[in-house]
UniProtKB/Swiss-Prot annotation:
The gene is RGA1. The record marks 829 as: Arginine finger. Residues 212-221 have a biased composition (Low complexity). The modification Phosphoserine is found at residue 291. Coiled coil: none annotated. PROSITE patterns: LIM_DOMAIN_1 (PS00478), LIM_DOMAIN_2 (PS50023), RHOGAP (PS50238). The modification Phosphothreonine is found at residues 278, 532. Residues 250-261, 270-293, 467-478, 529-579 have a biased composition (Polar residues). It comes from Saccharomyces cerevisiae (strain ATCC 204508 / S288c) (Baker's yeast). This is Rho-type GTPase-activating protein 1. Residues 411-421 have a biased composition (Basic residues). Residues 454-466, 583-600 have a biased composition (Basic and acidic residues). GO terms for cellular component: cell cortex; cell division site; cell tip; cellular birth scar; cellular bud; cellular bud neck; cellular bud neck split septin rings; cellular bud scar. InterPro entries: Rho-GAP, Rho_GTPase_activation_prot, RhoGAP_dom, Znf_LIM. It comes from the Eukaryota.
């Protein structure tokens, strides 16, 4: 117990846990540290009471440089720091908050994202919102089914060997070859049709994009209708199949049988099944209107009145008599037409329809999808019959016929084709191209007029049929059409005005030439009504008035060319209008068609116009801003020119004043007393002679008028016995009334580099009115060095009889007396208390050599930074600095000419051995020695003593962090400066370098 009792009396160090028995110690609250333990735990940097440091919760010390910075605001954290465990990022308590709601994060529960920190509530909301949008995106994603590939049944592909059978030629039908289908082929099937089941497979007139053959848009439309079985007539179809197996059809068009596009067989219901599986596409706007379902019932047009009794009514048992009557009233009228020779009706096997090429079938299915909604209209079924006039499809080669067949049994039904009414939008835009050029001699028959009126009435209905699906009585034209399905025919006008049909085959061209007709009517697109009902084709191209034109409306595409449709009389040629008028009207038609835009294009035009207006407004704003900027630029240019002229005048004035000041310095004037009769005594003001730079550089001086007392300043110089240098003395301010000789002259004071407000010993001294007195007592006291802050270094040394001033030696001895002072961090860099420094300066100024022979003990118990401040301040207040004004320019020229900063750089605060062994170093050293020889002896000794002291301080640079170059930065402003003070910024680097170079190599330079 006796051994531990003494240890309990001593405090223990917080860091090393050892007892503090001797020496100094740092105390912070109840904790104590050794002086060597009071350091940063990271960088081991020694700390002091003036250092910026923090005490961690563990008791460890950390300096300001090593402390954590906030990740958000970037400021040093001087209190509580929150460090994230995942990223090791530090946040201050103010920045540790949610970036969404801005609330502080409680309980250190957070979520870190790329956007920043989130509290848990905001993070959960963000996750829920993201999940909701992903689910919504997944629901809205559409996957449209792809078009099914047509299935080709190879089991039914039998080659069709057709033998040509020449049917009986009639007066109204030219000869055409038909094929007799052998008994080994698949029996044809009788199909019961209904208007609701009829869907065209291929109608190019409504979709120009599918027409890849380059044919005309209107005259080259090909329509292939596939008639599928009705769902509620299955038994009837099966009976027809059985009867068709016993007696297959014997006749078929030779060209249809031999067409390569009909080489594959498919079940008759295959197209219907594919239609049911195909998704409906969006159709254009003109096909959206549909008639009611009750009206979608076609009427059968019979060949004879006798056969009309055998045709069963449409299979729709759910409809009552009133509905049937209404549908009949709203449907096209039935026309009974006599067939002069019904046995020669062109028929073909519907089994061959399924034998189409897959490419054609796919195209057919695509067109079915596009036209399904448009073609559910009331239709008229007309039994195919022979005609003695050329069919309309024979002229317009690309409009396909719809074929049907039936056997001669009692149950068999005449297969008819669908003739739905033309679209209202198409028919209302028809107009004759020959308006105004009609032959006045040609008159239409009453039947033709009735047909014209009926066609106009039909245009008012929602007719969706092409209007060109008429029975083909010209079998040669039909053969040409079927034979050239792969290469669709082109219609063009020849030079002689005849209509020519060209195709890939020469035979088709020749046959078409032989069967082209001339219409006696000059009215284009107008069909004359024949005299007999046998020549009537219901709902083909309706007769039009001359006021109707072909036009493009609502996005529907029709032909821009005008074709003359032959009448139903046997005439050999087609009459066309004049070619010049045709070209002129075609251009007019093109302009009219282009002038009408669809709604989407109109919307785009409106949007584009809106954007154009906005751009024009922005352009006007930019132009106005540009004008304002140009005005400002012009004003700035004029201002710049005015400033340049002022600067030039000021520079010339400055140079003149500088020359005057040099003359005054070389020839210091004697200040004489000016006396005028009964004028009041003149006051002489003497100020402390410090040439230290003021805070505001006196570059301009005030002009005094002749009516006021003029001020004159002069810089007095005293030539010493030992040196030739001129020591600047304190300026003397003399005020005197203006005399008669200089009343009209403006006096300009010379530049003075001092700030009298900086010194405490400024006092006003009255001047005796004695003309023989050269200078005042204060001037004599100033010149002998008795005044501390006003005497030159040479005068002060002579006054004290010392090699260096006492204030310098006392300060240096105090700093070097204690090793702790030399290790103090930031020595000469940190500033002491200004009040204490001024108090010490007053004590040094009051000390007199004659009264006190001993060195004063002024710096006892003073702070280190206060003592270093007194030393630096005395050097800075010297009227002529240590490196005098006379050697300033030679030193700067030496540094710049030798390029010492580039060739002899400081590395780690000192010159390297390689640099010291270079020729540049040797030449620079010798030149520098020659320049420093011009210094006064007192300046030279002070420079050497100061260099030795700086070397001792740099030995402790590991502790005090003050290298040679850092100390040079501190001392350079007080040791070297130019006389005018204008080159402080320009020569700053050179001044700092030369001071560091001399401090580091003073042993070689200051010998």
């Amino acid at each position: 117990m006796a051994s531990t009792a003494p240890n309990e009396q001593f405090p223990s160090c917080v860091r090393c846990k050892e007892f503090i028995t001797t020496g100094h110690a740092y105390e912070l609250g109840c904790d104590r540290w050794h002086t060597h333990c009071f350091a940063c735990y990271k960088c081991e940097k020694p700390l002091s009471c003036e250092s910026d440091f923090l005490v961690l919760g563990t008791g460890a010390l950390i300096c300001f440089d090593c402390s954590d910075s906030c990740k958000n605001c970037g400021k040093k954290i001087d209190d509580l720091a929150i460090i994230l465990s995942s990223s090791n990022e530090a946040y201050c308590s103010d920045c540790f908050k949610c970036c969404k709601c801005g609330e502080n994060i409680a309980d250190l529960r957070y979520a870190k994202t790329k956007r920043g920190l989130f509290c848990l509530s905001c993070h959960e909301k963000l996750l829920a919102k993201r999940k909701y949008y992903e689910e919504k995106k997944r629901r809205l994603k559409k996957n449209l089914p792809s078009l099914p590939t047509p299935v080709i049944d190879n089991g039914h592909t039998d080659e069709v060997s057709a033998s040509a059978v020449l049917p009986e030629k009639t007066f109204s039908r030219p000869a055409s070859l038909v094929n007799e289908i052998p008994s080994g082929s698949e029996p044809s099937k009788d199909i019961e049709t209904n208007s609701s089941d009829i869907v065209p497979h291929f109608i190019t007139g409504y979709n120009d994009s599918d027409d890849n053959s380059g044919s005309s848009k209107f005259g080259s439309n090909v329509s292939i209708d596939v008639i599928g079985p009705e769902e509620n007539s299955t038994e009837h179809v099966n009976d027809d199949v059985k009867e068709e197996a016993e007696a297959p059809s014997a006749n078929m068009s030779l060209n249809v049988a031999t067409d390569p596009t009909l080489s594959c067989k498919e079940p008759p219901s295959h197209s219907r099944n594919l239609l049911n599986k195909t998704p409906l596409r969006n159709s254009s706007g003109q096909y959206l209107a549909k008639s009611p379902s009750s009206y979608r019932q076609g009427i059968i047009v019979n060949d004879s009145l006798e056969e009309s009794d055998q045709i069963d009514p449409p299979n729709n048992s759910s409809r009552n008599a009133s509905e049937l009557l209404t549908s009949v009233l709203h449907s096209p009228v039935s026309v009974n037409m006599k067939n002069p020779k019904g046995s020669n009706t062109d028929i073909f096997n519907t089994g061959e329809i399924s034998q189409m090429d897959p490419s054609l079938s796919r195209k057919v299915l695509n067109n079915i999808v596009e036209e399904t909604n448009a073609l559910q209209r009331p239709v008229v079924e007309v039994v195919k019959e022979d005609r003695s006039v050329p069919d309309l499809a024979g002229v317009q080669q690309e409009q396909a016929e719809k074929y049907s067949y039936s056997n001669n049994s009692g149950k068999g039904r005449k297969i008819s084709r669908s003739l739905s009414r033309r679209s209202k939008d198409l028919m209302i835009n028809l107009k004759s191209r020959a308006t105004g050029k009609q032959d006045s001699n040609v008159k239409l028959s009453p039947a033709s007029k009735v047909t014209s009126r009926r066609s106009q009435d039909l245009m008012r209905d929602n007719d969706s049929h092409t209007g060109l699906d008429t029975p083909n009585s010209n079998s040669t034209s039909l053969d040409i059409l079927v034979n050239n399905q792969k290469s669709l025919n082109y219609k063009r006008f020849t030079d002689n005005g005849t209509l020519r049909v060209t195709s890939g085959k020469e035979t088709a061209l020749e046959e078409q030439k032989n069967h082209s007709f001339k219409s006696p009517s000059p009215i284009d697109h107008l069909l004359q009504s024949p005299a007999t009902p046998s020549n009537v084709s219901m709902y083909r191209t309706p007769p039009l008035d001359s006021s109707l034109t072909f036009d493009r409306r609502n996005g529907s595409s029709y032909s821009n060319q005008n074709y003359s449709i032959p009448s139903w009389q046997k005439t050999p040629k087609t009459q066309l209008e004049n070619s010049d008028n045709f070209e002129e009207q075609k251009e007019t038609l093109y302009e009219n068609s282009e002038s009408r835009n669809d709604p989407s294009l109109d919307k785009e035009i409106v949007t584009a116009e809106h954007y154009l207006k906005q751009l024009k407004i922005n352009l006007k704003e930019l132009e106005s801003q540009r004008e304002e900027l140009m005005k400002e630029i012009t004003e700035m240019k004029s201002m710049k020119e005015a400033l340049r002229r002022h600067i030039e005048s000021y520079n010339s004035e400055k140079n003149k004043l500088y020359l005057d000041s040099n003359e005054l310095s070389n020839n210091p004037p004697m200040i004489n007393e000016i006396s005028l009769g009964e004028s009041p005594p003149v006051k002489h003001v003497a100020t402390a002679s410090s040439v230290a730079r003021s805070s505001v550089k006196p570059k301009f001086w005030k002009f005094f008028s002749s009516a006021k007392p003029q001020t004159e300043q002069s810089i007095q110089g005293v030539s010493t016995n030992n040196t030739n240098s001129i020591v600047k003395s304190a300026p003397v301010l003399l005020s005197a009334p203006s005399s008669g000789s200089n009343s009209g002259r403006l006096e300009i004071s010379p530049p003075v580099l001092q700030n009298p407000n900086e010194f405490s010993d400024v006092r006003l001294v009255p001047i005796e009115n004695d003309a023989n007195m050269g200078q005042s007592k204060d001037g004599e006291e100033y010149l002998d060095g008795s005044n501390l802050y006003g005497s030159s270094l040479v005068a002060r040394c002579n006054y004290e009889n010392n090699e260096i001033p006492m204030i310098l030696s006392v300060c240096i001895d105090f700093i070097e007396s204690d090793e702790e002072n030399m290790r103090s961090e930031g020595i000469y860099r940190k500033s002491g208390s200004q009040l204490v420094i001024e108090e010490i300066e007053k004590q040094f100024s009051a000390w007199k050599v004659q009264q006190n022979t001993e060195t004063p003990n002024i710096l006892t118990e003073q702070d280190l930074n206060v003592v270093t401040g007194v030393l630096k301040r005395y050097l800075r207040k010297l009227p002529n600095p240590i490196f005098t004004f006379q050697i300033y320019e030679p030193l700067m020229r030496l540094v710049k000419s030798k390029k010492m900063m580039e060739n002899l750089p400081f590395v780690g605060g000192k010159l390297s051995l390689e640099a010291k062994n270079s020729d540049t170093y040797m030449s620079s050293k010798s030149a520098l020695k020659n320049i420093l020889e011009d210094l006064p002896r007192e300046h030279y000794r002070v420079l050497r003593v100061l260099s030795e002291h700086i070397e001792k301080v740099t030995r402790y640079s590991h502790w005090n962090r003050m290298t040679l170059y850092n100390l040079a930065l501190v001392f350079a402003p007080g040791l070297i400066r130019d006389f005018s003070g204008e080159k402080d910024i320009i020569d700053m680097k050179e001044r700092n370098y030369i001071v560091a170079f001399i401090f580091g190599n003073y042993k070689d330079i200051l010998t």
